[in-house]
Every structure is written in C-alpha cells, then in structure tokens.
Swiss-Prot record:
Pfam (any one): AA_kinase
InterPro entries: AceGlu_kinase-like_sf, Asp/Glu/Uridylate_kinase, G5K_ProB, Glu/AcGlu_kinase, Glu_5kinase, Glu_5kinase/COase_Synthase, Glutamate_5-kinase_CS, PUA
Protein name: Glutamate 5-kinase
Source organism: Erwinia tasmaniensis (strain DSM 17950 / CFBP 7177 / CIP 109463 / NCPPB 4357 / Et1/99)
Cysteines paired by S-S bonds: none
SUPFAM superfamilies membership: Carbamate kinase-like, PUA domain-like
Compartment annotation: Cytoplasm
Cellular component GO terms held in the UniProt record: cytosol
MF annotations from Gene Ontology: ATP binding; glutamate 5-kinase activity; RNA binding
Annotated catalysed reactions: L-glutamate + ATP = L-glutamyl 5-phosphate + ADP
Pathway linked to the protein: Amino-acid biosynthesis; L-proline biosynthesis; L-glutamate 5-semialdehyde from L-glutamate: step 1/2
Task of the protein: Catalyzes the transfer of a phosphate group to glutamate to form L-glutamate 5-phosphate.
Positions with a binding annotation for ATP: 10, 169-170, 211-217
C-alpha cells in the first residue's frame, strides 16, 4: 500500500444528479464504494458535497418557487437533512461513520473559527470518520457565502492539510475548447501555473442545478495549488477515478502545486513576523531539538507579547538562542496561566482546552 494520503473529494450537483432533476442513488453508491475502498486502505477521505437544493426540490415534489434567495434557502434547509441522511446510509453499508460540517465564509475568515473548524475536521479524520462538508446555504447570506462548493473544497483541503483535491464533474477535465460544441477540443492533461489564457478556456459554463462551472474549478485549483495541494478535475463517471487519483495515475486535468504543503507551511511560518515570544527551559529545549517533540506548557518559563491563538510566535532558550518559530495553540493570556503546569491541568486551569501542547510539532519550524 502507498503511504497514507488525505484526499478531499468535491462532488458537484451535476455528478450527484447525473444531469437529471433528482439525486442519482446508483451513481452515489458507486462513488461511496470507491471512497470506502480507499478508507479501508488507510487513506483519509473528506467529502465536499453539493446537492442540498436538488434533494430539497425532489423531496417537496418539485414545487414551483420564485427564483429568490429565500426560496433557495428553503430548498437547502429541507434538502440538507435528506442529503446527509443519504450519505450516512451509504457509508454505513461499509461500517464507516460520517460527520457533518456546515460552513460559511465567516467560519473561514475569522481566525478563531477557522482554527476551530480545522481542529474539528482533523479530529474527525484522526478518529477514522469521514467528514461530509457543505456550505450552510440555509442561513448564509451573500456577504458570508463562500459562493460555490468548488472554492469551499479548496478551503476544506487547506483545513484538512490534504495531499490532493479532486473536483469531480460531468466533464473529463479542462479542454482546449468546449467539447460539447467543438469536436476538435483536446483534453489538457497537466497544468503548472494558471494564467489568463487558461482562465479564458474555462469560460463561464454553469450546470442547471448547480452554482459552479469550470471557471470556479480553476479558482479552486489556484487556491489549492498555492497552498501546495495538487488538484485534479475529472469526470465523476470515470470507473475507479478516486483510486486512480490516490495512485497518481493520469486522470483528467492535473494542476500541479509548485511546492509541497509542508514547504508552503514552512515558508509561511518563517515569513510571518512573530507576535510574541516564549522562553523555554533546558528540558523543553532538548525535547524540541533532539527528539522532535511538541512544546508542552510545563517547559515554558517566560512569555512576552500579546498574541492570539493561531499566531506565529518565537521560541528561545534560557540563553537567548532563537530555537524555533511555531503556531500557538493558546493566546498569550491563556499561555501565561498554563505555563509551568502539566498538560493534564490545562482544562482545570482554563475551563477549556485545545489539546495538551502549547505548540504542536507539526506547527513548528526549528531555526
């Protein structure tokens, strides 16, 4: 088996309905089977699903509603519960639990809420639960909507620390022209860097029941690739498409990231000006440098500056040596309260906890 990968799979309305007005259960069953197969092989799968409005419209018997935001939110409110129930039923066949996450732009733009969403998503994955993500269309206004699930899936891939993002659609990938009206159109296999010429190829096509077209998929690919995540646009009807993407077989159009997620994260941590500083004792210093450990509150001697949870801070030794930079799990006020204490005491001291470490090893770059 190849090393474990984290794959975000985005399923658009056109894939879930097969181009009809109702959810195509047989098609969804096959996609879940593929996901379950990769889950059993040790890979981590995240689903970003569209289809709430389509499910709501089907459940209500295709009512004639005015094309207003309120009507769309009504359909989403009715359909979301039906949609998540369908995913739950399908994955339960394979003994796999799912966890629903409904997000809005506000959840991803506010640092504290972003970190909470990230922690929830990664906790689901760590416990072998498949996250099923959708935008919270029933309450989202234009000001707080991500806008489409293509861009939402790119943000979910960043939250999950994904290796790859797979955008499944009713097309094989990105073509040199629209294949529906140009028989000479050729599939573009590999893309390294998205420019205006490529965006022009994407056009503004949108399926009848969805909100995304090829243009939004390019936006999503650009976001993900900038974060070090390879992105693939492929046909949801292609047999074994999910396994082929995991195995890095040629599928659809692959947008290659110019750097790995780790390299991207290192660049961000090194480049961010430290918002504060921690001085650690010799035991913590040894654990960080010699054993590659996380920084525990017990080893913190001094704290300087005022910083928020999720900001980059500097770690120094008692002798003043610049040891590392890392992302703080706690704000400066909380850090001052737990410094010098055992991790088991964090919850008792603060009344809450974001885990046993002050800075996790995965969020730390040694100088």
């Amino acid at each position: 088996m190849s090393s474990s990968q984290t794959l975000v799979v985005k399923l658009g309305t056109s894939v879930l309905t097969g181009g009809s007005r109702r959810l195509n259960r047989a098609h969804i069953v096959e996609l879940v089977r593929q996901c379950a197969q990769q889950h059993a092989a040790g890979h981590r799968i995240v689903i970003v699903t569209s289809g709430a409005m389509a499910a709501g419209r089907e459940h209500l018997g295709y009512p004639e509603l005015p094309p207003t935001i309120a009507s769309k939110q009504l359909l989403a409110a009715v359909g979301q519960s039906r949609l998540i129930q369908l995913w739950e039923q399908m994955f339960s066949i394979y003994g796999i639990h799912i966890g629903q996450m409904l997000l809005t732009r506000a959840d991803l733009e506010d640092r504290e809420r972003f970190l909470n969403a990230r922690d929830t998503l990664r906790a689901l994955l760590d416990n072998h639960i498949v996250p099923v993500i959708n935008e919270n269309d029933a309450v989202a206004t234009a000001e707080i909507k991500v806008g489409d699930n293509d861009n939402l899936s790119a943000l979910a891939a960043i939250l999950a620390g994904a290796d790859k993002l797979l955008l499944l659609t009713d097309q094989q990938g990105l073509f040199t022209a629209d294949p529906r009206n140009n028989p000479q159109a050729e599939l573009i296999r590999d893309v390294r860097g998205i420019d205006d010429d490529l965006r022009a190829l994407a056009g503004d096509s949108v399926s009848g029941l969805g909100t995304g077209g090829m243009a939004t998929k390019l936006q999503a690919a650009d976001i993900a690739c900038r974060a070090g995540i390879d992105t693939i646009i492929a046909a949801g009807s292609r047999p074994g498409v999910i396994g082929d993407v995991i195995a890095s077989h040629p599928v659809g159009t692959c947008f290659h990231a110019l750097e790995t997620p780790l390299e991207n994260r290192k660049r961000w941590i090194f480049g961010a000006p430290p918002a504060g500083e921690l001085v650690v004792d010799d035991g913590a210093l040894s654990a960080i440098l010699e054993r590659g450990s996380s920084l525990l509150p017990k080893g913190i001697r001094e704290i300087s500056g005022n910083f928020s949870r999720g900001e980059v801070i500097r770690i120094r030794s008692l002798q003043g040596r610049d040891v590392a930079h890392g992302v703080s799990r706690y704000n400066s006020d909380a850090m001052r309260m737990i410094a010098g204490h055992h991790s088991q005491q964090i919850g008792e001291i603060l009344g809450y906890e974001y885990g046993p470490v002050a800075i996790h090893r995965d969020d730390m770059i040694v100088s």
